[in-house]
C-alpha cells in the first residue's frame, strides 16, 4: 500500500493513518525476522525497505506536531 507512495502523498496522511501504517510495517518486520530465524526463504531487501519507510513516516509525523 504505502510502499508505492512518494513523499508528498505520505505527508498528506493523517496521524492515525501514519500510526496504523507504522504498526503494520513493524509487524511485517517481526514476521520477516521470524522467517529468517527459522531459515525460511526471505527477500533480504525487504528489511531495509520497511525500516526506511518506518523512518520516513515517523519523521513526517514529528514534523507535523
Curated annotation (Swiss-Prot):
Domain of life: Eukaryota
Main subcellular location of this protein, as a coarse class: plastid
Entry GO CC: chloroplast; cytosolic large ribosomal subunit
InterPro entries: Ribosomal_protein_uL29 (IPR050063), Ribosomal_uL29 (IPR001854), Ribosomal_uL29_sf (IPR036049)
Subcellular location: Plastid, Chloroplast
Assigned keywords, A-Z: Chloroplast, Plastid, Ribonucleoprotein, Ribosomal protein
Record bears the keyword Chloroplast: yes
Biological process according to GO: translation
GO molecular function: structural constituent of ribosome
Coiled-coil portions: none
HAMAP family named among the record's database cross-references: Ribosomal_uL29
Family: Belongs to the universal ribosomal protein uL29 family.
Full protein name: Large ribosomal subunit protein uL29c
Amino acid at each position: 500500500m504505502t510502499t508505492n507512495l512518494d513523499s508528498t502523498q505520505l505527508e498528506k496522511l493523517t496521524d492515525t493513518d501514519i500510526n496504523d501504517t507504522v504498526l503494520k510495517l513493524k509487524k511485517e518486520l517481526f514476521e520477516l525476522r521470524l522467517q529468517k530465524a527459522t531459515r525460511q526463504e526471505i527477500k533480504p531487501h525487504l528489511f531495509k525497505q520497511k525500516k526506511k519507510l518506518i523512518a520516513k513516516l515517523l519523521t513526517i509525523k514529528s514534523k507535523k506536531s
